[in-house]
């Protein structure tokens, strides 16, 4: 079994996502695919959050661009009309949630750490939903259900005992292709959305590879591939 992590540049465009599809579908052994948000989306989510918290209505334009980016990608990577319509509906449901959160931030002119964590989680939730419908036989798993964190010194630290246990339970039996959003996690105590910080998708991949004793862990981007 191998774990492959694809960064934002590797899932940043129609062509790059189709390249991911080709790479993964050529692998014969079971594989876990970890994806980041579409290239540039995490930064855009953070910037839009800041604008909304300052009462800058221009955040709506940024949000519109985020929505258009994801819908354009869906149009380019999913040929089957029925599947495409289904994915569009699911993606729009997530984007509607995101829009409501931004509206709340704008109205109260405040952005808490908890709300910020929730907002940035949508990047990976959206990308993983899209990519899971591009790769043949891929099964989507929600990282919030098995990567758990506890708060120490005002930071989210992985609760490895619980996380390793949940990972082994979740991925048994192991599907041919498991699609996993990187970066995101949830609190052991409250269940609220947390994240693993910058570079968190690499961390997600290494956590999974270690817990499941993977033969190979590959960190891929358009620029290079590193095998660990």
Q: What would you call each of these model-derived segments?
A:
Residues 1-226:
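Nucleotide/pyrophosphate-binding catalytic subdomain
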């Amino acid at each position: 079994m191998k774990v492959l992590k694809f960064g934002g540049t590797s899932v940043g465009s129609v062509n790059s996502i189709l390249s991911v599809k080709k790479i993964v579908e050529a692998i014969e052994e079971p594989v876990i695919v970890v994806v980041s948000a579409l290239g540039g989306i995490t930064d855009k989510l953070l910037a839009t959050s800041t604008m909304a918290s300052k009462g800058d209505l221009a955040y709506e334009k940024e949000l519109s661009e985020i929505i258009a980016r994801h819908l354009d990608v869906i149009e380019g990577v999913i040929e089957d009309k029925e599947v495409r319509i289904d994915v569009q509906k699911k993606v729009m449901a997530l984007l509607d949630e995101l829009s409501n959160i931004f509206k709340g931030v704008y109205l109260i002119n405040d952005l808490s750490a908890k709300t910020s964590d929730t907002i940035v989680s949508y990047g990976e939730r959206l990308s993983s939903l899209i990519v899971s419908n591009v790769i043949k036989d891929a099964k989507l798993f929600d990282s919030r259900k098995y990567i758990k964190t506890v708060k120490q010194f005002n930071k989210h630290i992985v609760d490895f005992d619980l996380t390793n246990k949940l990972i082994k339970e979740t991925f048994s039996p192991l599907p041919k292709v498991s699609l996993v959003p990187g970066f995101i996690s949830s609190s052991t105590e409250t269940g609220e959305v947390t994240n693993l910080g910058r570079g968190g998708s690499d961390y997600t991949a290494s956590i999974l590879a270690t817990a499941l004793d993977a033969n190979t862990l590959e960190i891929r981007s358009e620029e290079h591939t590193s095998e660990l």
